[in-house]
Amino acid sequence: MGFMSAKLFPSCESMCVCCPALRPSSRRPVKRYKKLLAEIFPKTPDGLPNERKIMKLCEYAAKNPLRIPKIAKFLEQRSHKELRSAHVNFIKIITEAYSKLLFICKEQMAYFAISLVNVLTELLESKQENIHILGCQTLAKFIYSQVDNTYARNIESLVRKVCVLSRQQGVEHSLLRAASLQCLSAMIWFMKEHSYIFVDFDEIVQSVLENYRVEESAAGDEERHAPQHNWVDEIVRREGRAGLGGGNDVNCNSTAIRLRSARDSSALTREERESPEVWAHICVQKLAELAKESTTMRRILDPMLSYFDKKKQWAPRQGLALLVLSDMSYLEKSSGNEQLILTSVIRHLDHKNVLYDPQIKSDMIQTATLLARQLRSRGIAAELVVAGDLCRHLRKTLEAMESASIEELNLNESLQNFLQDCLLEVVTGINDVRPLYDMMAITLENLPSMPVVARASIGSLLILSHIISLTSMSLNAPMLFPEALLQQILKSMVHPDVDTRVGAHHMFSAVIVQGPSRQRSESDFLYETKKWQSRTTSVFASATALLEKLRREKESLGSDKTGNMDDEKEKSISEEENKHVWARKNSAYFSKLVFSFTDRYAALTSSAEEANIVMLTEDQKNQLLSAFWVQAIQTDNTPFNYEAIGHSYSLTVISSRLKDSRNSNNIQFFQLPLSLRSVSLTSNGVLSPSCQRSIFTLATSMLAFAGKVCHITELFDVLRCFTSCNMDPYLRIGEDLQLYVRLQSDLGNYGSDSDQEIARSVLSDCRTKVGINDQRVLDVVACALCNLTEMDKDVLVKELTEMFTPEEVPLFGSNSAFDWANFHVQAFSDESLSFDEECSRTSSVDGGLHESPITNTGSSISKTTMPQSVPRVLGVGQLLESALHVAGQVAGASVSTSPLPYGTMTSQCEALGSGTRKKLSSWLVNGHDSTPDNPAPSLPSAQHFIIPKVNSCGFESSIRTTLEPCSAVKLPPASPFDNFLKAAYRAQ
């Protein structure tokens, strides 16, 4: 053997220089990695790891990647062995070796990744906490070294194991929770970087929230509400606002949130790295970074909101929801999806977990209010859909209060207050409120016919209207009344439910008056209104007086201040229940709703601020006057309906600027109350004496108020005998000449047999008084209007004596208004103009400011004798000839041929549509001939009459009485495009 090694091998080596088997063993790489692997472990289990040898092993693996699988296999086998022996120090060396491989051999990860995943699985399934910590830390390093989704499924398989470790309770497990949360933060980073959502993502979110709660519970209320972190108080201080908290839960302004800035996980101190609370905040921070899109945001918020429901963490002071969501919102500023958090919270109110729990809903709304205020402080406006959802929930709350028990009523009332707070914060942050008006119009368009639902819908929109009015001083509020909203409000004013009609008038008042409210004392409210102080103050007082009076009704009926109240208090409950329901319940519905809101938010307004009145267009004024006419002659009206009509009329008068000579509605504003007076004093079988008495009081109030606005002082002296007397036990005219309900009266007795007898006697006396001073009233009004309109007095008297007819028939339906003009058959026949004469007077597009309105297709309800002439129906040929005749007159008008701007063109289109179409429709309805040879109309026989009755289908139906309807034919209205073509043709 010595000969072979000493003589033979050297000789072979000198001859076979290329034989690798003959190289020295020190130069052979086959055995070297085993030696390096053996050197990284100390001689004893307690020995320190050799960092230099570990680094040398990794460098060797980087230079010899084909050896990495064998190195990984050795480490995996050694880890199994040491786990069985519970040698934690050796396991730590193995994990350190894998960590160095991840750092140095990143490009060769495919050679050892699966082996590392197997080792991590064994570590996480171990029973020792130290080994769990090593596994979590190594897994975090493995995740951060990923460059793609190759090992996403392998990482996903370990999510549940890490989440279980993160939920270990107790202070002794804080290091384990910190390590597991560090691993979870790495997983969230992986999902953000590689757009991959784990299947067990909900488990990650809940694990993070479990540790977030530990931090906040340990922090204590003192730190949570520390003044130096109170951003809410800073907002309140700058805005000069008082507390808005309504209810016993929490004052929103006294609740502060610690908004923490983002943390850098690589720059943490040792104490911070060992704190699970710090890592929980980092996880929330990375969740906010993960929510790049709205879909991802919802994916994150869904498990969060479900966790808050399950753990009852919605309370603003003791709960976790406000803390987490505020941090999410604050840290989400880079993506621009902050408002989605508020939207998701509001939509979560419909979730089955909280749908039937008013207390949890109240806590959620308080949280949403603070989130909305936080967004507003950063200049971020909430989505408009949030306001719509809040109104919907407010409607549900109001609807539930109709038939709730006392306990449920208190909970719903608290929820309602919090909804108002949240709605106020949302609307305050919206710069342009016009989309809100559009949303209100859409809601009113689909207003149901059921009284309870309709009242709740109107109530929610009424609160929104007052909020918009309250915040309109700082918003870009429109100077003109929204057209679409007005159309739907007018439609709601003829709703089947009488209280819904009152609510529609309240909405009109809240929208047309923008600015702070002026509170009135109870004594002034109960017995007399405040004196006329200024235009603006009285306007808003008029808009809110009705609501306040309704709210005070039950208190006044139940108090013992006067003898009348004592008498009503002594009445039995059964007698009151037999009365009309509206008199004791629904009459105070909207007042309790709105004035609770007004009282709570009175501190938000400054006494120096003045209210603004939204302007109305000419068409809108005509529609409102027509609406007041239609509503005033409804047979089921209550005193509150007449009061609402009177207040809406007063606001319309003030908005119309009657003292302006350019106002084309001056005559109609006086013609309407004069016509209502004539209707109230005309005996007929449709309106009851009680209604006629109320209409007379309403007409007197309207006439006196219009005269005061126009400074016709003599008119007030003439009407003093009607304004100061107590002829109506249910309605009175205050010192401001507006109509008010006598709340101390027995409202349930309105319309009874005894009341009808009293009303007949009162009407008889009124006929005598009116006959004496009627001509005097006409002279005074005509003389005053002469100076405003520059028209002849005789012409004004003639127009004032004509019966008012509604302008916009299609708005209320074909049979919704009464043709009261047939009360004066002979006068109408003598004074009527032929169609050609009327067209010649109003053929100019820009002229004819005082055009005759459209006469309603309904015939007179009077029982007086009328000519028994058969109505003549025009043929198709005659209708076409009439239309061509009018078109020829319009086309032949002298117009400048120069190019017109778009605004002028649209004005001509509107004038054309509201001019010639009215003349033609008025002529057709009244039965004029197509030639000027026969100017007298053919009046129908009075056998039947159609009384408008609202129902669920558009709120209208027809009820036939013993009168015959007149047959009338009307051309269909021209489309806006036709009007534009006609105006464009004229401009050429």
UniProtKB/Swiss-Prot annotation:
Pfam families from the xrefs?
A: EFR3_ARM
BP GO terms, sorted: cell differentiation; pollen development
User: In which tissues has expression of this protein been reported?
Assistant: Expressed in root tips, and in the vascular bundles of leaf blades, leaf sheaths, and roots, especially in their sclerenchymatous cells.
Q: Which domain of life does this protein belong to?
A: Eukaryota
Polar residues composition bias: which ranges? 853-865
Q: What happens when the gene is disrupted?
A: Inward rolled leaves due to the presence of defective sclerenchymatous cells on the abaxial side of the leaf. Narrow leaves and reduced plant height.
Q: Name one GO cellular component term.
A: nucleus
- Give all cystine bridges in this chain: none
Tell me the keywords, alphabetical order.
Cytoplasm, Developmental protein, Differentiation, Nucleus
Enumerate the residue ranges of region (Disordered): 844-865
Per UniProt, subcellular location reads as: Nucleus; Cytoplasm
Q: What does this protein do?
A: Functions in regulating leaf rolling through abaxial side leaf cell differentiation. May be involved in the transdifferentiation process from mesophyll cells to sclerenchymatous cells.
The name on file for this protein is Protein SEMI-ROLLED LEAF 2
Q: What lineage does UniProt assign to this protein's organism?
A: Eukaryota, Viridiplantae, Streptophyta, Embryophyta, Tracheophyta
Could you tell me the gene encoding this protein? SRL2
